[in-house]
Amino acid sequence: YAIDMGPWSFIHGEAAREGGEDCLVSARGLKTPRAGLSISMGNPHTVVMLGSDGKLDGLDLHSLPQVNPAPVNGTNVEFVVPVDLDVESGAQVGAIRMRVHERGVGETLSCGTGACAAAAATRFWGGEEAPDEWLVHVPGGTLAVTFVLGPDDLEHVVLAGPAQMVATVVLR
């Protein structure tokens, strides 16, 4: 299943584009604050790149990460680590592992808009050579994220992944 999630954008505009970061993020399990990049997918996200799986796995995301400056209405915070891929077809595909703290909820197993924001930030950091297709590995499974030109001439994000019927409900 796939859906066009719409265009992505920088929350802090040109300053984020020029510097590649727009805030500092503190979280339990990190010794020092890390640079983050705030991305809008229609809702706010702040993405932080970490250097190793150990750092990602060592985070305690039961507590709200602190973002300074934070977007006005708060933000979901995604922590990512790059993943090496062996792609036999020769197609260029990026891959990251992600964990997310969703505002008002805490850590969740997956977040569709978060996966899109994380791929957008990682792709931005990768520069012009970064791929348009990404695999985002979250605790709940793997999602595919693709960047395409939308009908409005903006860059849109297409999210794809498995779907499973979990209940049938009859309302009366």
Stretch-by-stretch model annotation:
Residues 1-110, 119-172:
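Active-site proximal loop and beta-alpha junction motif in alpha/beta enzyme cores
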